[in-house]
Amino acid sequence: MPVDLGQALGPLPFLAKAEDATFSASDATQQRELANPETARQLFRQFRYQVLSGPQETLRQLRKLCFQWLRPEVHTKEQILELLMLEQFLTILPGEIQMWVRKQCPGSGQEAVTLVESLKGEPQKLWHWISTQVLGQEIPFEKENLTHCPGDKLEPALEVEPSLEVAPQDLPLQNSSSATGELLSHGVKEESDMEPELALAASQLPARPEERPVRDQELGTAVLPPLQEEQWRHLDSTQKEQYWDLMLETYGKMVSGVAGISNSKPDLTNLAEYGEELVGLHLHGAEKMARLPCKEDRQENDKENLNLENHRDQGCLDVFCQASGEAPPQTALSDFFGESEPHRFGGDSVPEALENHQGEGTGAHLFPYERGSGKQPGQHIQSSSLGELTALWLEEKREASQKGQARSPMAQKLPTCRECGKTFYRNSQLVFHQRTHTGETYFHCHICKKAFLRSSDFVKHQRTHTGEKPCKCDYCGKGFSDFSGLRHHEKIHTGEKPYKCPLCEKSFIQRSNFNRHQRVHTGEKPYKCTHCGKQFSWSSSLDKHQRSHLGKMPCP
């Protein structure tokens, strides 16, 4: 079954109508569009949850779109499985290869694998297709010496499926001077404060000079607009690298726009109107990355959802995919925090930094170092997932505490004892702890006049006077005044000895007996006579010794 450019290349312009479509039989035009499995697939993959519609209606529409795409009444289970596997395989391909393979319309996963493997022996085929099919540049076939696949076409115009007619107010973007330019940029906000070396004119379109000699020598002149070779020679290597990445991103934007908008191809010989919008976008193979803007005028319901399709071309997809549980669609986007341009990680928490990036729309770095983190601009932290970012954040906080820095604001607000500095989660815990310093007691026994801090201790003490033993052993029926005593007794019946000495492997039922046994190996003598200073390992030995000073019993 034919597969189009797919979800990784941006949302469809008629997506705004997809959620409210009723698919009535009276709308013949819309029925014809939805009869196309590829159109139904795009609608299914890019469908968004609407709070006003409710979960039941949303599930109904989603089920209908899924049936229109997979067509279970026509396809077998094996064919449906093959469609799903093909979709996932194409989704995880690098951006440039994915564009080319999708254009060949593979019918199965094996056909897609064959197309990808064909590029290994003939890498020029990909760049020839980009120049001829996407840019419309005329490159002599003999010069490229290519062997094309049966599905490889060399016509300068792309053949596209007919799309739904969308009114201007239904377009996903507003406030645009050029509707086509806005659709190509897929919601990328113009940046007025971009760095000078990144704000290059479209006429300075470079090819990579060192790493791709074949591509530069054979396609460098053809890719550049006319009469711009002189400007190209004056660019340094960094500018050429940056603009080559921008050019590849432009290809993806244009192919995505053509696949879902119309069959007209915009003239890219003058990219000045798209230059600022496309600066900062990242594609597979890019080693330099500028700022990653987010859409400023996003609808309110998009803030409640993680709309992956609107962020797919902005490099921040890995972070959102981690939150939503969906796998990153492209290998290129998984390198968002790559080695070539590691992003700065500031003092904000991960949720705060993510919220700032999603809501501000200022084009700032995802984790800017300027936000009170104390890090210098040159200090970078590399990461590839949200979990690694969290680990790095915790490591930063741990290092800060080791250096003697002040506690976090949250720790400063917790109840703290002024006497010993202990911190508690509740004020009630602090109040109870302070009684240990003041000696204040609330529970007094009227029989022996003993006082207790805890009510539980007071209740246990009263049972010594009343003889109450509410805790009964299930094995022998013996009663105990508290549950802890019952637990120790039950271990006699079960033979459980959880405390084992690592030196002599002797086991004990109670922790207290285990602690006393360890003194045999360590030689510890915690009990000291106040008269002569002699020390003992056991309290019973100290009692016998003290009697010798009182004259009751000679010292053993």
Curated annotation (Swiss-Prot):
Protein name in UniProt: Zinc finger protein 18
GO MF terms, alphabetically ordered: DNA binding; zinc ion binding
Domain of life, per lineage: Eukaryota
Residues in KRAB domain copies: 218-291
Domain spans labelled SCAN box: 41-123
GO biological process assignments: regulation of DNA-templated transcription
Cellular component annotations (GO), alphabetically ordered: nucleus
Purpose of the protein: May be involved in transcriptional regulation.
Keyword DNA damage carried by entry: no
Region (Disordered): 169-195
Localization terms from the record: Nucleus
Pfam families, A to Z: KRAB, SCAN, zf-C2H2
